[in-house]
From Swiss-Prot:
The keyword tRNA-binding does not apply. GO terms for molecular function: protein-membrane adaptor activity. It is a lipid-anchor. It comes from Yarrowia lipolytica (strain CLIB 122 / E 150). This is Vacuolar protein 8. The lineage of its organism: Eukaryota, Fungi, Dikarya, Ascomycota, Saccharomycotina.
Length: 573
């Protein structure tokens, strides 16, 4: 199952980091031009005043609000100066101020920073992008920066020959990309191609920020498609072998998100033959978060049958089995979600059982209070039971039925639904029906037909119906005719009169199995129940064509119920 998830699939995000802290700001007080061996002062009067004010503010920086009118005017004066030294001083001041004071700011605060960002001087670019990256930690600022056109100069800086400038620009874009409102704009801005290129940078800081930015772009299907079109897949796959744990984590998580989409899985399958091998290896990583994302990536890939087989053939099962032993809940959840998808393929049922998963799955079912883990666990058991009588027997022998009986009445609704579905599949095994009845599962299935969840009701009824067919000993049905919760009798009456064709079909079919059981006690109980007899006769006399507003499938379903009721009605006389 792909993730919604997610997901629940781990919508992981990273924040961009500045590559290096700019030096502390020093305000140039007497810049000039060399004339006859002397430096003549060239500051305008307003610049002199701004420098003096800024020096005073910096000396008392702990008590000054640099985003208020006076300090901001002084900084802006330096920004708009024609003097490069004053511009550098302003950029460095903004970088230091924003590192320590992150808050929502207005356009007046952002305008001078964005102007500095467009400067051609690398030192100014580096400090300005660091300041903007700091401001972009705040969600409100992220939106405003983009609205004010901050992308364009950042994209240009990503292509700078200066590594420090590159790194800070990418770090800023990484932060901006964590906001949902910005992601599609980034995807359309032309930033993905340089980001993808920088993900292969020789500078690990640039590579880390670029990979994190790519990860932040994988949280919507449209943006994922833009990313794939920009050629990100082969680069992300190559980064799985990175020695940097952050790069490994970002690339693994990005690929996991990309694999949510069926079209992308096909591209991965055709172009990346070693992807599964890389991900299996990463499940043995020393980093739990890398292990977790590797398992989730395999889970998403295993939404396709070819990948389900490939993971098993690539010897992925022992690595997943090891993750089951972890005490780290997210890791166990990722592993069991992966094995659930792998278990969908009939050819994988026996290898999974032979790898020793059954005992672990049953233990996990009872040991975990995590609803998702329980759902994935019991769903895996159901998948393993789907096509083999032998597998059904091994699942029962592993204690799965006793564990379900113990837990199901108090389990969350989703877990109840999965458990009753599993019991319904197990109840199809002709050689197991007597064993299941002896284990007492009717005692929990009957009350669950009263559930307020329609799936739990239907699954429980289907399990009872399956158990009623060709079982040697019908004592359980006789003994539970009236208890618990109204017993078999009330269950049949409710479903026969429900008006739901699926429920009606289950009930009529169950009545037929009980009548054909050759157990006279059951025949007498059925014939003496006026409500059951009347309900069967009423169903048998219905118009088999259904109502005018019914769709074709609904008409077919109702027709089957009517035909089955016509077969049962004479047997109740």
């Amino acid at each position: 199952m792909a993730a919604s998830a997610a997901d629940r699939m781990g919508r992981q995000r990273m924040s961009g980091l500045s590559c290096s802290a700019p030096p502390r700001p020093t305000v140039v007080t007497n810049p000039g031009n060399k004339q006859d061996g002397n430096y003549a002062p060239v500051l305008a009067e307003d610049e002199r005043e701004a420098v003096a004010l800024l020096l005073r503010y910096l000396e008392n920086r702990g008590e000054v609000d640099f985003f208020s009118n006076g300090p901001l005017r002084a900084l802006s004066t330096l920004v708009y100066s024609d003097n490069i030294d004053l511009q550098r001083s302003a950029a460095l001041a903004f970088a230091e101020i924003t590192e320590k004071d992150i808050r929502p700011v207005n356009r007046d605060c952002l305008e001078p920073v964005l102007l500095l960002l467009q400067n051609t001087d690398p030192d100014i670019q580096r400090a300005a992008s660091a300041a903007l990256g700091n401001l972009a930690v705040n969600n409100e600022n992220k939106v405003l920066i983009v609205e004010m056109g901050g992308f364009e100069p950042l994209i240009r800086q990503m292509m700078s020959p200066n590594v420090e400038v590159q790194c800070n620009a990418v770090g800023c874009i990484t932060n901006l990309a964590t906001h949902e409102a910005n992601k599609s704009k980034i995807a359309r801005s032309g930033a993905l191609l340089p980001l993808t290129k920088l993900a292969k940078s020789k500078d690990m800081r640039v590579q880390r920020n670029a990979t994190g930015a790519l990860l932040n772009m994988t949280h919507s299907d449209q943006n994922r498609q833009e990313l794939v079109n920009a050629g990100a897949i082969p680069i992300l796959v190559s980064l799985l072998s990175s020695r940097d744990p952050d790069v490994q984590y970002y690339s693994t998580t990005a690929l996991s998100n990309i694999a949510v989409d069926e079209s992308n899985r096909k591209k991965l399958s055709s172009s990346e033959p070693r992807l599964v091998e890389h991900l299996i290896k990463l499940m043995d990583s020393g980093s739990p978060r890398v292990q977790c994302q590797a398992a989730l990536a395999l889970r998403n890939l295993a939404s396709d049958s070819d990948y389900q087989l490939e993971i098993v053939k690539a010897n992925g099962l022992p690595h997943l089995f090891n993750l089951f032993q972890s005490t780290h809940t997210p890791l166990v959840l990722a592993a069991v979600a992966c094995i659930r998808n792998i278990s969908i393929h009939p050819l994988n049922e026996t290898p999974i059982i032979e790898a020793g998963f059954l005992k672990t799955l049953v233990e996990l079912l009872g040991a975990s209070d995590n609803e998702e883990i329980q759902c994935h666990t019991i769903s895996t058991l159901r998948n393993l039971a789907a096509s083999s009588e032998r597998n059904k027997l091994e699942i029962v022998e592993a204690g799965a039925v006793q564990k379900c009986k113990e837990l199901v009445l108090d389990a969350p609704r989703l877990v109840q639904s999965e458990m009753t579905a599993c019991l319904a599949v197990l109840a199809l095994g002709d050689e197991l029906k007597g064993t299941l009845l002896e284990l007492g599962i009717a005692e929990v299935l009957i009350p669950l037909t009263l559930s307020d969840n329609i799936e739990v009701q239907g699954n429980s009824a289907a399990a009872l119906g399956n158990l009623s067919s060709k079982v040697g000993n019908y004592d359980t049905f006789v003994n539970h005719w009236n208890e618990p919760s109204g017993g078999i009798r009330e269950f049949l009456i409710r479903f026969l009169t429900s008006g739901d064709s699926t429920f009606g079909h289950i009930a009529v079919w169950t009545v037929l199995q009980l009548l054909e059981s050759k157990d006279q006690r059951l025949k007498d109980l059925l014939k003496n129940s006026n409500e059951i007899v009347d309900a069967i006769h009423q169903l048998s006399s219905m118009n088999s064509d259904g109502a005018d507003g019914d769709g074709e499938d609904m008409r077919d379903s109702k027709s089957e119920v009517v035909m089955l009721a016509k077969k049962v009605a004479p047997l109740l006389k």
